[in-house]
Amino acid sequence: MEQLARLYHDHIQVLNQRVSEIISRENLSGLVIHSGQPHRQFLDDMDYPFKVNPHFKAWLPVIENPNSWLVINGSDKPLLIFYRPVDFWHKVADEPSDFWAEHVDIKFLTKADKVAEYLPAGIDNWAYIGEHLDVADVLGFSRRNPDSVLSYLNYHRATKTDYELACMRKANEIAVTGHQAAKTAFYNGASEFEILQVYLSAISQGENQVPYSSIVALNENSAILHYTALEYTSPAQRRSFLIDAGANYNGYASDITRSYSFEKNIFDDLITAMDNMQLQIISMMKPGVSYAELHIQTHYKLAQILLDFDIVSGDVQGLVEQGITRVFFPHGLGHMLGIQVHDMGGFLSDEKGTHVAAPEAHPFLRCTRELDINQVLTIEPGVYIIDSLLAELKQDQRQSQINWNTVDVLRPFGGIRIEDNVIVHGDRIENMTRNLGLNR
């Protein structure tokens, strides 16, 4: 923890430098960042699970305390307005005493609607950063989520500080423990629901604490890209298992996927081939490489795998150009990762917010930036038997290039996705996930 505290000190300095730069450019006095506030369910007296403003948790590992605020001018010690109501119905957050507390001035807010008393004078020259524009209006903010400020912050958020990298390594360590437990549960006959409970228990995090809804899919369900339905009974025949699940540490996310076959068969061989391909793509990563180009190269490598397994016929170039590989791999190669699972800034080419769209043929790619030092990205190629996409091939001449017998053999297994979390360094690539022992 002492090392993390030292890294946090440097982290805050970097964030202050960023704020100092952008408020100087925009002639602002500073930023007021709102953690957020609860959302009430319609016609009910309960709230949805609270999700903190990512710009707030970039500064502090305070992720479950709504109605809190940060006042930052880039030079003075940040002011944390920490919400601690008098409340006998709910758990009230403890007074901050962790390693980060000494780096901020703290004032306690007991009533959410009294925050104006703690905000700086001349509030119209401060920028509000947050979701609740109605609150910003009432408080007198005229600058609310300025595009220039958000673009600057989102662009630079891609470059992680050493503190952030340490947190993400820990988030991977936690998730790997869960993945190993989930794998054992699969081979021991657990249902999707039971596997998820094993995973959450192993990482000691609840469903509302993990960074995204976990995907735990058996058999054909593995072909549903964002499958979160969960079956409560085990299938009569156990064929395959795909788990896409992460963990949270100090507000930072891990995002890991693994695929398994219950028996040694063609599907197991296909997993091995995809695993090797994923590692090949990771080996191509270095500063200056286009992430979009990595995605395109993945399609060429996948085309060869489809040929090797007699899933399709033709040649690599033609399979890619005709869009056949996109039917089997319809999503993007991955995305930036950090305080959000799909971290902001993936489409920005500069700090002014210049947007670089995904290639027209690959609209679901979530990152088009050039790789640079201290960026963290996921690499997650996949191959799936998705009937709705295959049906499109049956409508034109491309159907003759599909070996439908092999497709029928693979259909009950669903699909494969293999995802690691990777740090780009100047002289190497750090695969946090594999370094922790979560291999094939």
Swiss-Prot record:
It catalyses: Xaa-L-Pro dipeptide + H2O = an L-alpha-amino acid + L-proline. The keyword Metal-binding applies. The keyword Amino-acid biosynthesis does not apply. One of its GO terms (cellular component) is cytosol. It is an enzyme of class 3 (hydrolase). Mn(2+) 2 binds at D244, D255, E419. Binds 2 manganese ions per subunit. Keywords: Dipeptidase, Hydrolase, Manganese, Metal-binding, Metalloprotease, Protease. Its EC number is 3.4.13.9. GO terms for molecular function: aminopeptidase activity; metal ion binding; metalloexopeptidase activity; phosphoric triester hydrolase activity; proline dipeptidase activity. GO terms for biological process: proteolysis. Gene3D superfamilies: Creatinase/methionine aminopeptidase superfamily, Creatinase/prolidase N-terminal domain. Mn(2+) 1 binds at D255, H335, E380, E419. Its cofactor is Mn(2+). InterPro entries: Creatin/AminoP/Spt16_N (IPR029149), Creatinase/aminopeptidase-like (IPR036005), PepQ_N (IPR048819), Pept_M24 (IPR000994), Peptidase_M24B_aminopep-P_CS (IPR001131), X-Pro_dipept-like (IPR052433), X_Pro_dipept (IPR022846). NCBIfam families: PRK13607.1. Belongs to the peptidase M24B family. Bacterial-type prolidase subfamily. PANTHER family: XAA-PRO AMINOPEPTIDASE 3, XAA-PRO DIPEPTIDASE. Splits dipeptides with a prolyl residue in the C-terminal position. This is Xaa-Pro dipeptidase.
